[in-house]
Amino acid sequence: MHMLSFIGALALPVFVCAQSCEPASLSPRLAGVDLEKFRLTPNAEYVDSDQQIPISTTNVGLIEQSYVETAIKLVRETFPTASFRLREDHYVGDNGVAHVHFRQTVHDLDVDNGDFNVNVGRDGSVFSYGNSFYTGPVPSITQLTKRDFTDPVAALKFALTHLQLPITAGDVSAESTEHPHKYILRGTSGAVTDPKARLVYLVKPEGTLCLVWRVETDVDDNWLLTYVDAKTAEDIHGVVDYISEATFQVYGWGINDPGQVDSRAVLTDPWNLKESPLTWFSDGQKNWTTTRGNNGIAQENINNLPTYLNNFRPDSPTQNFSYEYPAGGSPKDYINASITQLFYTANAYHDLLYTLGFNEKAGNFQWNNSGLGGKDKDYVILNAQDGASRNNADFATPPDGSPARMRMYLFTHTTPPRDGVFESGIVIHEYTHGLSMRLTGGPDNSRCLSAFESASMGEGWGDFMATAIRLKPSDTRATDYGMGMWVYNDEKGIRQYLYSTSMETNPLNYTSLNRMWEAHAGGTVWASMLYEVLWNLIDKHGKNDGPRPTFDERGVPRDGKYLAMKIVIDAMALQPCNPDFVQARNAILDADQALTGGQNKCEIWTGFAKRGLGQGAEYGRGRRVGSYDIPSGVCQKKI
């Protein structure tokens, strides 16, 4: 019997900021450097399932060879003269849709933001697709053959200086790898791992192709890919940050924070063997007696150390993780309870997401995938009471096969400070960054939520999932929710408005984005739209207040809450790399089409149209046109 002591709190975002704060940058920890101005500009298109797709791409049956061949054929027909490579992260989702990803190449170098994703339906035909391939003139190969570009060390040093990264680069050398233009940069200090550099092409905002060094640096607070001009090593064309801001005695699943209940619950063996067949305390090779297992490893990191394996974590030979959480106590006095709570919430969310389709093939976070697809050795490193910062939390999502990292901080808006792990919405928000980054663009590409609107949706998905999970049996569409209310000790929460279906309480709409430039603000708009869709689906299908969905024979959740969560997750895998709001809306409609045959078009369109993302809504850089129209015939009543 294994027991954990946890608090089930579920509701805060990364790099959160109270309403009185200045807007947070892409990553506010780089003092004096605003990374927002280095965001990549999206250039993707998305062809949804309602549009005409060439019939010649149809194959019968959904075996791997067929769906991959179908996808290759579509790319070749769409771009007959383009060079590209098939990525290895293709898979069939549990909704029956196969996802295949390609990377454009020029002179055998990747075009790092040249992506093509193809979604193949159950019948073997193309369901939808997205792409951001470069279509302009291909540069001469002369620059490569004559090696008319700087060395990677120069690119690293410029990135360190220009972005003020805390890495010392004295006598640095570039060590070759098996790839002819990929290097490990040895001899630095201050980074978690040795920086890396790879020669690639990048499509610039004006549509030209530029040869760049992609410099990767992990300094704990920021895990950056910096695109440095390869010819001069004196210009940065873009930056991507991977970081988005037993018996257990815990606050159980669905309890958002200590303010909702008087005491914690004692839970015995809270895992589901279908979702965690190794339980939460084994990786298939060793059975642990501490907060470590296949899905995550939790420990304190009060001293902000870059390592984690030797950090303190509670240990119980009987796996009885019941620890005191004294009201008004100092954080250090309840560190065992804190680590246990974090371990519980992260594992419980892993299991729920697994049920909803985020499994090994889709790139989930597990040390051992047991041969079920995806890449191993990428559980989540879970740091409780991390000393790197205060009043925040963050999540780093590298590509599939590398561990993710969640850092939970103390919040100093009360005396004594409050520990963010006890507001489970914060943990869920952070973990959702990993979900959305692994699914959008495929498990091997963590660069697909780096533009303003896509990064905003990354924040919005976190708020949405945290809010959906904490709905109570008595809630109705008139119930409003805030984010971060407990840690900030503020009933209004940390967002500009509460999440509400009332336009008086929350007036945000699509064109509100025209006045925004920061991802958390934009994320509130997206989550507000999803909250409308959520309640439309609950009103139609009812609400399951249990911790797990039930499914019909087609694999469709039987209630509106879990159905909304399911189609939102499925849509992440359908949409293109760096989608805008319109494309992501269309992907949600497509997800419902693939899962239910489009039975919920009216509810989905009505939710989005209410907040300006109706049929005629258009995206333009810096200027968006709203629409409150619903397509004709979508909401016709049946006689």
From Swiss-Prot:
Q: Where in the cell is it found?
A: Secreted
Please name the catalytic residues of this protein. 430
Q: Which residues form a coiled coil?
A: none
Q: Which CDD domains match?
A: M36
> Among its keywords, does the record have Protease?
yes
**Cofactor comment:** Binds 1 zinc ion per subunit.
Q: Does the keyword Signal apply?
A: yes
Pfam families xrefs:
FTP, Peptidase_M36
Question: What cofactors does this protein use?
Answer: Zn(2+)
The UniProt keywords, alphabetically, are: Glycoprotein, Hydrolase, Metal-binding, Metalloprotease, Protease, Secreted, Signal, Zinc, Zymogen
Q: Which GO terms describe its biological process?
A: proteolysis
Query: Which ranges of residues are annotated as propeptide in this record?
Result: 17-245
What are the recorded GO MF terms, alphabetically?
A: metalloendopeptidase activity; zinc ion binding
| Sugar attachment sites | 287, 320, 336, 368, 509
Q: What family classification does the UniProt entry report for this protein?
A: Belongs to the peptidase M36 family.
Name this protein carries in UniProt: Extracellular metalloproteinase mep
Taxonomy of origin reads: Eukaryota, Fungi, Dikarya, Ascomycota, Pezizomycotina
